[in-house]
Amino acid sequence: MAESGVEILCVGTELLLGDILNGNSRWIAEQLAGLGLPHYRQTVVGDNKERLISAVREARQRCRVLVTTGGLGPTPDDLTTEALAAAFDTPLEERPELWLEIQQKLSAGGRPVAPSNRSQAFLPRGAEVLPNPKGSAPGMIWSPRPDFTILTFPGVPSEMRAMWTETAAPWLQANAGTSGVFVSRQLRFSGIGESDLAERVADLLASTNPTVAPYASLGDVKLRLTACAPTADAAAELLLPVEAELRRRTGNHCYGVDADSLASVVIDLLKQRHQTMAVAESCTGGGLAAALTAVPGSSSVFQGGVVAYSNAVKQALLGVSLDLLTAHGAVSQPVVEAMARAARERLNCDWAIAVSGIAGPGGGSAEKPVGLVHLALAGPGGCEAWVQHFGERRGREAIQRMSVIRGLDRLRLCLLAQV
């Protein structure tokens, strides 16, 4: 007997080989949690009919609902519908009204109608069409067995999401026996490691409703809080006291929630204080400016930046003296201090972050190894500088990313400390 619950089956050799990031499974998992549907397994299968059939038959033994993405196009390697029908010895039938709709959609979009498109109008006997409002590839809702239902979606994320929202989610709510509504909230932390954070909140990690789970990524640690209740409002209420206690224990290490980034938080703090900022970058190559300008509305507080990669540009655009560069080198505290002060003055702003380091893989020495980064922050109260040792094992991209994070976080803390 199959368990109650949902499995996700993503189809496509491009997913299996890692050529395309599988964002569909993550999004669907979030939607299932919001519907209160238990979800225990995700599978990726390449464009191979026999392996698809095997994966579907195995899922049949474990779950009551199988959600598939991919393999619904008109090309020879789009095998999902054919494999599903074969898995349950069910013939495919052409749906004339569906074929007409496919032709109309293609023509309306200025695309030619190829003979191969007709294959998309074939569904297993007894299947219900799952309409695609954004594309030509229809999905289906099909129950080949009384206690087992399959929902199929194309792999294109925008099409899949529209189909889910308009048709699949209401169907699942009405037919899949939800156990409650799950609500999640993610707290984001900086300047604290995963193990240190876990020690501070060890007792809360053992709670069951809400659950608290740590996740770590480069320069960022997260705690995901998840609660289940009959309604979304009731689940959200369960989260409130736990979130308050987590914030109390971690202080300013907690910089935001959910989609917040350090850059977006810094932008908001600057707006609240009617202040502006700029950057002067060397080893990050514009990474600081890119992070800030990725935030909508950043133009009201971000004046601009200088990517001074060479010593000549440091001299010409930031006025760093040749004597300073000769005496200390580009990767040094005196130079980043001069860069930060110059950026603040020349771009006429309240704050300026400067960074210069050795991101590698070459260019390091015993005195200044790969991973050494000097940063400075010039502000209304003066200029402070500090050094980070990220180590050469992290790699160039990680060193650059960590430098951006450390610079933004120092500015965040200084803004919070303002009276």
Curated annotation (Swiss-Prot):
Family named by the database record: Belongs to the CinA family.
Protein name (record): CinA-like protein
Gene3D superfamilies: 3.30.70.2860, CinA-like, MoaB/Mog-like domain
Lineage of the organism: Bacteria, Bacillati, Cyanobacteriota, Cyanophyceae, Synechococcales
Any Pfam family: CinA
Domain of life of the organism encoding this protein: Bacteria
SMART domains membership: MoCF_biosynth (SM00852)
